[in-house]
């Protein structure tokens, strides 16, 4: 199934049903009076988080969604039927945004969570509602109110405990294959991974966590090189990042340079994401001699001034991966325990999470704006100058400019 994590749709709630104007007409009953019923309310539109979905592809080709209209009122004080609500199922981790105001309507982060995105219209009133002591036969009704209509953007971020970060061919997919049952494609060329992959790492019988593998970054990704940096949004909700570095790159490049490239691109996307807990994982240690391995590890650590955990592993040979998995599980458990018992720590993490979300949202919006400009033939907003010559389409030739003024 095709992986789609961003779509734009239009939703329309159902209009309310109109009120009915009717009078009681029955044998032997004179001046029966009004008996027009109210209309029914229009159906609303809801988003529902479904844990069985992992892509927004269903909304790529069906972009208009409308809830049912409320029925009109009837005679004998019959109220119209309420329109059926429309439930749109989306993957867990979907953010719903109003496309016109860029306001975040809500995040669907728990299975079964519901979010109303368009309110159904109110019902109209029948003429029975308007009878009074001075108006025994009212001929007044009200129409139903129109339902809300909204243009929405939906962005899906995978929900994972651990995120993998690194250059292409750093061994991210091989690592996730070695520690979980996930089987992402692995090959010896760049950008083998084109979409995020999730794997469940079982540490003990009752202990596990979810790990996310995203496409690799290259230098200049923040400016659109390679696959860009849009996929970094999937790391915004992770609890810890594993920074994978290839100790034995095929092109003979420096592992320290590769590590710096990733950190720079990460900072371009979200400076707050750099403050997330990050562990340095040096992969492919089995491909070089021990002396050279120690020298390269020392070079990377010193170049980055790294103070966090450092692991030297071989994902393909499963060397060091088990210890890393156990340490990750222990860290996640300690983190959850501290969140529950330390309010100051919980507040600090909540503030960091919000900063990451805000910066990621702003970065994605900037990328969308740039894409819109490119579609209109403008490379950037700086190319739009102050053009005061508003009528320069036809009269830019040399010579006097004549402006006709109507008396």
UniProtKB/Swiss-Prot annotation:
GTP binds at residues 166-173, 191-195, 213-216, 283-286, 314-316. PROSITE patterns: G_OBG, GTP1_OBG, OBG. It is found in: Cytoplasm. It comes from the Bacteria. Disulfide bonds: none annotated. It is an enzyme of class 3 (hydrolase). An essential GTPase which binds GTP, GDP and possibly (p)ppGpp with moderate affinity, with high nucleotide exchange rates and a fairly low GTP hydrolysis rate. Plays a role in control of the cell cycle, stress response, ribosome biogenesis and in those bacteria that undergo differentiation, in morphogenesis control. This is GTPase Obg. The lineage of its organism: Bacteria, Pseudomonadati, Pseudomonadota, Gammaproteobacteria, Pseudomonadales.
């Amino acid at each position: 199934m095709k992986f789609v994590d961003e779509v734009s749709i239009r939703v329309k709630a159902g209009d309310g049903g109109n009120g009915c104007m009717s009078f009681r007409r029955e044998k032997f009953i004179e001046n029966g009076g009004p008996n027009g019923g109210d209309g029914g309310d229009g159906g609303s539109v809801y988003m529902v988080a479904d844990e069985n979905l992992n892509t927004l592809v269903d909304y790529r080709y069906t972009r208009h969604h409308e809830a049912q209209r409320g029925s009109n009122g009837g005679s004998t004080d019959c109220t119209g039927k309420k329109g059926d609500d429309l439930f749109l199922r989306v993957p867990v981790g979907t953010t719903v945004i109003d496309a016109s105001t860029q306001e975040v309507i809500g995040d669907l982060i728990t299975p079964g969570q519901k979010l109303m995105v368009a309110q159904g219209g109110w019902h109209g009133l029948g003429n029975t509602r308007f009878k009074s002591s001075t108006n025994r036969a009212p001929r007044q009704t009200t129409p139903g109110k129109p339902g809300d209509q909204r243009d929405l953007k939906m962005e899906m971020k995978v929900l994972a405990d651990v995120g993998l970060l690194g250059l292409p061919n750093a061994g991210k997919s091989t690592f996730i294959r070695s520690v979980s049952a996930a089987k992402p494609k692995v090959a010896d060329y760049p950008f083998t991974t084109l979409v995020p992959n999730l794997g469940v790492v079982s540490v003990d019988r009752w202990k596990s966590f979810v790990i996310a593998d995203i496409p690799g970054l290259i230098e200049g990704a923040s400016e659109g090189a390679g696959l860009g940096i849009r996929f970094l949004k999937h790391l915004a909700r992770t609890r810890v990042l594993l920074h994978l570095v290839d100790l034995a790159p095929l092109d003979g490049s420096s592992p320290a340079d590769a590590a710096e490239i990733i950190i720079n691109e990460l900072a371009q996307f979200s400076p707050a994401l750099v403050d997330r807990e990050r562990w340095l994982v040096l992969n492919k240690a089995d491909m070089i001699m021990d002396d050279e391995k120690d020298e390269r590890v020392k070079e990377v650590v010193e170049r980055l001034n790294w103070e966090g955990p450092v692991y030297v592993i071989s994902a393909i040979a499963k060397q060091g991966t088990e210890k890393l998995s156990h340490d990750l599980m222990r860290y996640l458990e300690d983190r959850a325990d501290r969140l529950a018992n330390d309010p100051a720590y919980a507040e600090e993490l909540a503030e960091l999470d919000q900063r990451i979300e805000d910066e990621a949202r702003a970065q994605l919006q900037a990328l969308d704006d740039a894409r819109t400009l490119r579609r209109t033939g403008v490379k950037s907003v700086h190319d739009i100058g102050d053009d005061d010559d508003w009528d320069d389409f036809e009269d830019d030739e040399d010579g006097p400019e004549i402006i006709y003024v109507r008396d």
